[in-house]
Amino acid sequence: MIVKNEAHVIVTTLDNLAKYITFDYWVICDTGSTDGTQDIIRKYFASKEIPGEIVQHEWQDFGHNRTLSLRAGYNKSDYLLIFDADDSMHGNFTLPVKWTHDCYLLKFGSGMTYYRPQLINNRKKWMYVGVLHEYLKAEEPVNGECYLDGDYFIDSGKTGDRSKDPQKYQKDAQILKAAYYKEKEAGNDLANRYAFYCAQSFKDSNQVDDAIEWYTLVADTLPNWVQERYYSCVMLGQLYERKGNFEKSIYYFLKSSEFDSERIEGVVFACDRLRRANMHQLVMMLYHKYKNYNPDPKNKLFLFREPYEGLFEYSASISALNTKEKPLGFSCARKIILGTTNDNIKNAIFDVLRFYIHELLDDIDSLDMFYILTSIIHTSSNPALATIWNLLFKKHKNDLIKTPKPIKVKSTTVEVFLSFTSCKRLDLFEQTVNSIMNHFLDKEKIDYWFCVD
């Protein structure tokens, strides 16, 4: 870790890490703090009785100073965690059970994900390359890398000292622009990486025309890594949309597939815009071509999750109504309800389902859909959900209240007591009891059933 004036955030960051990892030693490099960051760090680890050291380095650039930080910590542990002072871990992160690789890449982000090498063999020598958006490079032979998947993510913070500067991204863009031309003149491939992150910084500073210029350079001209070219196309699609250029927006969204046929974000974003423009035939043509996509592509740069969580099927379910492909449209809607974890898309599909009532009632497997709707209806204010639920309830009522198989009566002390009231409606009483018997997963735990008439 390298720090400068992080007194306002460093304890929060260290507390967050301590929830997930037990450290044997720590090395943090300070590059000129004037707010007492160094003493806060020393006192924190002293209170935990964890040995370590603060190292002072003069600031030059990220690649240089991160390399100095690695050298300061070299060989003082078996493995080294690299972490920024304002980042935070979330979810259920666990360290590898067996350390089989020299480099482990950790997951960043939730809605948009990417991986970075953050956990490395500290008996090997490493360095960072680049003045900004630097990358890790081994200085000696290493035993491969491994992506650490799991139910966790690291949030890249925006509360550190550097993020306080409102001109941060503008300054970054100029640094990267100058670095690009310097490396280009020297004939170094590092220039291509600088071009991509120059585009990123122009985009983050809301300089749209400059961002388009540099993303276009990456997408159309430079021999960048295919992931950078893919993402550049998606960004160009979004930026041209902001400028009101529909044709170029769609062009670059679709061009993305030239660089990675496994990723579908560009195609799905194009379909979303085409659907809104009532170009339904094009939506369905694209859906037929790409519908057998991989729902969980790995090892991608800046992956948008929403296109893999039902957004593609949502567009197809609407466009299919206009292209007389209702069976396919209904299957898309059904797939969303049964499979997606995206609550926004799932809630939106209920309005679409109103146009598929005939298909819904004819669906022989709609009981599974009813159970899912039952589990979420109390969390939704969408009246369309209640309409669909009522239709499915009427359709499956006989299945829900059919006479169940008997259960064994236990002769034990009564611990679980279930009571009912009834009033001259034996038929309704039977339906209630039968529905409980059919759907309570732990009904065997009921010791005594009691009815007051």
Regions found by a protein language model. Give the residues of each.
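Short, acidic, metal-binding catalytic loop of nucleotide-sugar glycosyltransferases
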Residues: D15-D24, I28, N434-I446
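Conserved donor nucleotide-binding strand/loop of the catalytic core
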Residues: D39-L68, A72
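Active-site beta-to-alpha loop of glycosyltransferases that engages the nucleotide-sugar donor
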Residues: M1-D15, G32, G244, F420-Q431
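Cell-envelope/extracellular polymer assembly enzymes that use nucleotide-activated donors
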Residues: Y25, V414-S419, D447
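Catalytic-site signature of metal-activated, phosphate-bearing donor transferases
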Residues: G63-L70, F83, D87-E213, L217, ...
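Residue at a conserved register position within TPR or TPR-like alpha-solenoid repeats
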Residues: F202, Y240, L274, S319-A320, ...
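A conserved acidic beta->alpha catalytic loop
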Residues: N16, C29-I41, E58-W59, C451-D453
